[in-house]
Amino acid sequence: MRSYDFSPLWRSTIGFDRLFDLAESAQRATEDNYPPYNIERLGDDRYQISLAVAGFSPDEISVTAEQNVVTIEGNKTDKTEREFMYRGISTRAFKRQFNLADYVQVKNASFDNGLLKIELVREIPEAMKPRRIAINGATSDNLHKLESRAA
């Protein structure tokens, strides 16, 4: 019996509470997995993306939020010629995109000890939140009063 791991289909989406286009996500899952990242749920409407970008400085990384997509790009500019006997720290250029659900916004980005952390918050407008509607009509007390008057 075969088992399929669908976790790559879910890991680049944040705040979605519904299924999305699996074909598009499957294509994204086959792409390069650099840099490694985590997506954490910090609360009901709070999320955090952490990317391991060791070897990059904050001015070599750009974070762009446009519509429902967060794009993180890194370009290492090594101006000095150095001779490495072994190079294990990757400094290649990268571009990583994350699709966000409606009303999820980037609140903050911070860089500390080689980790880029991007804080996200889902803020649903008041007009879009569910609300309870009062039903107007005859209550059972009013109905009994009307019946006793009729009798």
From Swiss-Prot:
Q: Which PROSITE patterns match?
A: SHSP
Q: Which InterPro entries match?
A: A-crystallin/Hsp20_dom (IPR002068), ACD_IbpA/B (IPR037913), HSP20-like_chaperone (IPR008978)
GO CC terms in record: cytoplasm
Question: Where in this chain does the record put each sHSP domain?
Answer: 28-138
Coiled-coil annotated spans: none
Keywords of the record: Stress response
Q: A Pfam family in this protein? A: HSP20
The reply on keyword Transport is no
Q: Does the keyword Phosphoprotein apply?
A: no
Which residue positions does the secretion signal occupy?
none
**Annotated CDD domains:** ACD_IbpA-B_like
The family note in this entry says: Belongs to the small heat shock protein (HSP20) family.
Query: What is the protein's given name?
Result: Small heat shock protein HspD
What is the native source organism of this protein?
Answer: Bradyrhizobium diazoefficiens (strain JCM 10833 / BCRC 13528 / IAM 13628 / NBRC 14792 / USDA 110)
